[in-house]
Amino acid sequence: MNLGGLYNILYKVVNFKDYGNPSSRTRTLVIGVRKDIKEITPCDVFPDKQPERTLREVIGHLPSLKKMGEISENDIYHNFRKYNPKMEAWISDIKEGQSAFDNTDINRIPHTVKNGVVVYNAQKNGDKYTRQYWDKVAPCIHTRNDIMASQNTVHPVDNRVFSIREVMLMMSVPESFNWSDIPFEKLNALTPKEKEAFLKKEEMNIRQTLGEAVPTIIFRQIANKIRRVLCKPTLTEQDAKGIIERRKLTDIDNLLRFIRTNNSYKFAELSKIAELANAQRENNAAYYTRQDTCFTIISKLPEAKEYHLD
């Protein structure tokens, strides 16, 4: 269905790590605003750029898990997922950024034994069995975040894949989110055997859901912006004229001061006030251009990231 006739549409390929998500995740983000909403464009509800966060900042506060099968006493989702014990030697000596395939001891290179013959695993992707960096942005979370043979899954220090809780934090899923009808407090009160049974049943579903997810922090930003622009009363021409009269904005110095210091009105409203405060607007055609019209013009322009101003 072609929605271009009904919506102003903005689409961008972005890495969500630049917009507040704690891990790298490149996706195409598409936002549409109905054309009958004249003063709101997709740019008004697009998420804001934010500084990147390192993996240490995101999960560094969680306790280390050294023992295979260990489950944090206070958090059932912070767990050391079990794997074949022989695989621990493959990753135990590698440093941040290194892969098990970098081991100089051939016995520590990922392999299987078939009919008594050692068969080394294929190194199709350089990010398999790779220990992650503490002080870089967390990697993209994939569906198979439960195994070391997947992409970028090995903890920076511990000899394990990231726990469910760590993956949740990297995907900006709130700690209060419930994966089960069983209350979190009750899950933590289970015996170790009961916790193991619960995780055996639910862990893969949780991990795959996280691997397929879109970071919640991105759509929380979009939703909050939509709520703000839709709930804010529309500034009428009469309202704008009242502000101009009360603040004496026909004086250019007063007008500039008002625009620079006022946080109550968005750009479109300030532009409308500036136009009406300009007594000479008919002489020099200094008219306000509606936001949807501006968007229609700029949306046809090429990306400017390769251009530089001298």
Protein language model features and the residues they cover:
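Short alpha-helical patches at coil-to-helix transitions and adjacent helical residues
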Residues: 27, 212-219, 290, 294
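S-adenosyl-L-methionine
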Residues: 233-309
